[in-house]
Amino acid sequence: MATIRRLQQTLSHLRPPKAPQLLSIVEGPTQPELLDITLGELLTLQSLQYGDYECLVFPWTGARWTYTDLKDEADRVARGLLAMGIQKGDRIGIMAGNCEQYISVFFAAARVGAILVVLNNTYTPSELYYALGHTDCRLLFLTPRIGRHSLEEVLAKLGPRPKEQGTSSALEEIIILRGQYSGFSTYEHVIQRGLPLPSHALQDREAELHSTDVCNLQFTSGSTGNPKAAMLTHHNLVNNSRFIGDRMNLTSFDILCCPPPLFHCFGLVLGMLAVVTHGSKIIFPSETFDPTAVLHAISDEKCTALHGVPTMFEAILSLPKPPNFDCSNLRTGIIAGAPVPRPLMKRLLEELNMTEYTSSYGLTEASPTCFNALTTDSIERRLTTVGKVMPHAKAKIIDTQGHIVPIGQRGELCIAGYQLTKGYWNNPEKTAEALITDSDGVTWLKTGDEAIFDEEGYCSITGRFKDIIIRGGENIYPLEIEERLAAHPAIEVASVIGIPDQKYGEVVGAFLALAADVSARPSDEELRAWTRETLGRHKAPQYFFVFGEEGVDRTIPVTGSGKVRKVDLRKIAASVLERRLAKTAAIKEK
């Protein structure tokens, strides 16, 4: 026995040492260097370099502005704001569809050191009043209508001068951004007020500004409680938008078609600012999302890039192509906001020529992009991951105790770097919950998203923690079920949620949009069998709901930025199941 023990000891010394386990923490490149300029300085620099190049095109208004046009118009509006007494740090609200005046106001506010509060187009009057009150806006730029959404109730209630009329404690004046409305000042009036100002007034104000000043409040699209307003700086936005454009290989010859709204980081930063930082051109096809207008813009303007969330691309691809449609110039763009189903990706490559599309991940609090694929990444990488971490950013994945997990293990994604918000406006409690400083003095943003890194640093988002379905103690991830269901020839789109269940805690429920050419919907059992062909039995949906049936609206509920509102789907599911139960009980009584 002693001889055997000695032999075992000898062999154990001969074995190679175990390789240390790699942890899920990554850092982005340190080049190119960060720019230390304000948004106003950025626009001045780009107008000097690209002055006569077209910058903004709005087919629906007829506007075609060069870089010089944009700079000059922003200066005129900025002088008007100074004449109206706007001080550094004052909040200015804006609620409108995509239009050229929106962008001139954005840069004008930045030039005078004001903080632009971008307001969601889908806000109800009460949501708008909350946002205005929470941020104490002094001015509000508004249009009486945004698409089919009327804001006349707001105009009637607040009046032209709300503070003076006693309808608001802080809001001094409402400005009509486009067109006219009886009794209200207009965008043109703002410009006229600035005409008498001395020529040096704007330069004097700009000399007081710094790149680390807050210039933008972006409300998060939270589904519970009041939304929080993330404070973003010039430094955040200038640099994040540069790096986004770099990941798409944008040049001054590129033309981006941008359906996402300007009130969201997707349209404002990934779209407009990414273009401005690269001397490119951007096309906003319509006031609000219109898939027909997008198709015309792609073809008529010879676009090389296209942005959107998956629901937008689904809508675009569901339409017949216009006569003489040409997308041969299209190569890249960003798909973000929600996971991309494999069948949709295949169609983007085959039907829209987006061979260099990039996947992306970000959130408002990070200005927004944290990860973005390269155009040279393989199709499989771009489909299954959101690429690698952006320059000058760090990312880690932690467990519930806050420890960094090994590579290949799921956990909560956290972000650090220059792009983090300064916090939530007037909300220190929520700021402290989201921004955590570690023992090394590094501040990390807890995203609330579950993710996984591979050994090369590619990141895959595996779900929102709040969307994960826990069935009998086992985690089920909606994305893989959605992808499997969407691969069925009869299904156009699938959205999966958790349904409360007495036995298992939660079970799987699936909302389906049927393909246009389907004559009869597949049975529930057929769809379960389809799911079980590639996924475990417990992942097959117990309940199915079809848009346009059983009182469910035909339209998929989405946020203003195009993300599916799963919180609404859960409410709809509860209502439908209640009706089904009542119907079953009535039949039994007979």
Curated annotation (Swiss-Prot):
CDD domains: FACL_like_2. One of its GO terms (biological process) is cellular response to hydrogen peroxide. The keyword Lipid metabolism does not apply. This is Acyl-CoA ligase sidI. Substrate binds at residue 364. The keyword Ligase applies. Pathway: Siderophore biosynthesis. A motif (PTS2-type peroxisomal targeting signal) lies at residues 6-14. The gene is sidI. Its EC number is 6.2.1.-. Its main location: other.
